[in-house]
Curated annotation (Swiss-Prot):
It comes from the Eukaryota. GO terms for biological process: segmentation. The keyword Zinc applies. One of its GO terms (molecular function) is DNA binding. Residues 17-31 have a biased composition (Basic residues). Belongs to the hunchback C2H2-type zinc-finger protein family. Residues 13-59, 86-110, 142-190 are annotated as: Disordered. Residues 90-100 have a biased composition (Polar residues). This is Protein hunchback.
Length: 190
């Protein structure tokens, strides 16, 4: 019922897409601005060895910005989900008095939320806020999926090799720790 809600909200609220687009554009511009400031400050700090360090620092900044941007998306996605749930839950809770079948859950909330979303459009301020937040969250989720689908091949593949090496190193370390602990325990026991 999430997908049906999202599709219904997106169809009902075309304005929300424009609003989120402008917000996303501003956020992206902010990232570019911070990146330009860092690049401008790095050569000032090290003017003489400028040829090599800027390249490494730029690569590091790009990876750092990508990771930070991805983490920000993930952090943003969690509250978005909570916002969606919070925005969806009030409408069935309000309709609990009218329809006692809401508690069972998935099918009924869908039937109830659909007219509930149609009703808010008539009321001016409070209820329009909920569909816009949900629809903007939906657009954000879609954009996050697109961005994550594009970025992971670059960001995720390098960490895999160190992660594997860390796991492989960690496994014998754990075994060694267990063995040493057990032997020490045996010594203490003896």
């Amino acid at each position: 019922w999430y997908s049906s809600m999202f599709a219904a909200n997106i169809k009902q609220e075309p304005m929300s897409h424009h609003h989120h687009h402008s917000h996303h554009h501003g956020h992206h511009h902010m990232l570019q601005h911070s990146n330009s400031n860092r690049n401008a400050s790095s050569p000032r700090q090290s003017p003489l060895p400028s040829p090599n360090p800027p390249s490494s620092s730029n690569l590091h900044l790009e990876q750092y910005l990508k990771q930070q941007h991805q983490q920000h998306q993930q952090q943003q996605q969690q509250p978005m989900d909570t916002l969606c749930a919070a925005a969806m839950t009030p409408s069935p809770s309000n309709n609990d008095q009218n329809s006692p079948l809401t508690p069972p859950g998935l099918p009924n909330p869908m039937q109830i939320i659909m007219p509930a979303n149609m009703r808010p459009a008539t009321q001016p301020t409070p209820t329009i806020a909920t569909p816009t937040t949900t629809s903007s969250a939906i657009v954000a989720l879609q954009t996050n999926d697109k961005l994550q689908a594009l970025t992971p091949p670059m960001d995720v593949t390098p960490p895999k090799s160190p992660a594997k090496s860390q796991q492989s190193c960690a496994e014998p370390e754990k075994d060694h720790d267990l063995i040493s602990n057990s032997s020490e325990d045996m010594k203490y026991m003896a």
